[in-house]
Amino acid sequence: AEDWSKINVVEGFSPDHITHTRFSGEIELGIFEKEMELPGGLKKKTGLHHVTLHNCSIGNNSLIENIPNYIANYRIGSDCFIQNVNLILTEGESCFGNNTEVSVLNETGGREVPIYNRLSAQLAYIIAMYRHRPDLIARLREMIEAYSLAQKSCYGKIGNGVHIVNTGTIRNVCIGDYCQIDGTSRLENGSINSNREAPVYIGPNVTAEDFIVSSGAHISDGVVMSRCFIGQACHLTHLFSAHDSLFFSNCQSENGEACAIFAGPYTVTMHKSSLLIAGMFSFLNAGSGSNQSNHMYKLGPIHQGVVERGSKTTSDSYILWPAKVGAFSLIMGRHVNHPDTSGMPFSYLIEHGNRSYLVPGANLKSVGTIRDAQKWPKRDKRTDPDKLDCINFNLLSPYTIQKMLQGIDTLQGLKQTSGETSECYSFQSTTIKNSSLNKGIDLYTLAVHKFMGNSIIKRLEGAPFSDLNDLHDRLKLTDSLGEGEWIDLSGLIVPKQAVKDEIDRIVGNPDSTLEETESFFQAMHRRYYDMEWTWVCSIMPRWYGKTVDRLSPRDIIRIVRQWNEAVVSLDRMLYDDARKEFSMISRIGFGVDGSTRQRDFDFEQVRGEFENDAFVKMVCKHIEDKTALGNELIGRLETLMTSMPQH
């Protein structure tokens, strides 16, 4: 040691397990008395071997060995294992990635989001997209800067139970508890918010700078990222590269590339040839070769696009930004005319003969759409009890139903304007065929009946009522919020007015905090179904011709029957769509060296029989269950009607 007086040790300390170690500056040491068991069963005594420490504190029972360079300015916790790491240091004061500006959506700037440890998809959405409120953006920037300054330190932190092995350089990185870093190349200026409930894994050949990684994330196999926020339980592997991008909960990115994207929850891109650039996505499934252009070779990469929640891109799909694609759409082919299909959710956007064709509502009868809705909640890998993002998985919500209602009006308006016998109709740089238009109206109508009926049945399910007053009590509003337009805040479906009120509160209150805004999003998420009911009641006059307090038992029976017809009709469409996967065409390639009979047998061994398919069984059971649910409520309402005085 340069100065032994600067070395402080805890009571019970013994130097028996410290060898070939140099100390410099202020040093604090814990005890080294336990053994550490490594993978494969090897046991090692904790201690310090072949390491140089400068201005460091070490907790109890950590093992640090074989550090070719040195460790400087770090607070290292207990039960850590650090081996074969070239260099770990904090240089100067650092905020460890907090307040890093990420030029999301527009590579040239203008929508920068300052990242911080607790950034949620909802707050990032507002910062990126609400530039029409500069007073709000300035206030949020102040709040994030204040938070970041509170994280500022000359000392980095390595939490308890951390393993770092065979790694290159770690510079100005704050590492949370139970993180595992194995074979990583370089980490600079970042925070890894690992914890016991949701440890983070950073694997071989990862290079990252100016970043924040949230709990439960897995990053490995040559990922290269710069100026990125990685949300909870995200999975980035297999040479994926990203810059100036935000990834929120449960995103999965492999092989491809992301530039300036806003990847809301469940954005998935798995293929080498896929490029996501300058777009906002959520619940996306990107096919191989999917890409977009944000550059027209004029004023630079200044264009952006929005693909609303739940959409899919097929192999080799392409969109020339700017464009906006409606929720739960399927994008196939190349689209260069800047379509805006946000008013037509659940549609197919297909290229044919260099034209973009829109098939409204077609995705409502797709098996894939329903399977996605079922698997998203099951694929929520977040184990951290403190969940940063609010995620609503509903396919049908005020957000999508309001668009369907507008879609019905738009499609009917096109018929009136261009004539019912027109072969094709023009809509927002796309073409809609006559047959597609009429089917779209029918499909949207079925979906609205299904959603409205669902909401009413949920209110009355399991709720006893003995007279008309009882019935209307069950249907009363339980939340004052909910009327008007709804929006999707990258996973959180919420009334637009509620967001406006919160923005006004933030701007009008100089003492507002990030914690209060977090609490607002959480409260909106909890109140969703109550606010949804308020919205449903607000559109009953349009859809049913009556306000909720004027509904009679007979009216509700009619609504339930419409709901049941809609549910069964849509389910039968799903059933027929699933059957296509068992057609003769689907059997091509089976039984390669055999007869037709052997081909069919080979197919059944691999794929099973149609009637025994898990999804097909689920659809059939869904029809039975919903029919029984509707009949039960109709029975109770008919009983109520018989007990009511006749006029």
Regions found by a protein language model. Give the residues of each.
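Glycine-rich hexapeptide-repeat left-handed beta-helix
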Residues: 9-32, 36-48, 65-147, 182-183, ...
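Long, compositionally biased intrinsically disordered regions
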Residues: 352-647
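Long, charge-dense tracts
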Residues: 69-70, 74-76, 80-81, 86-96, ...
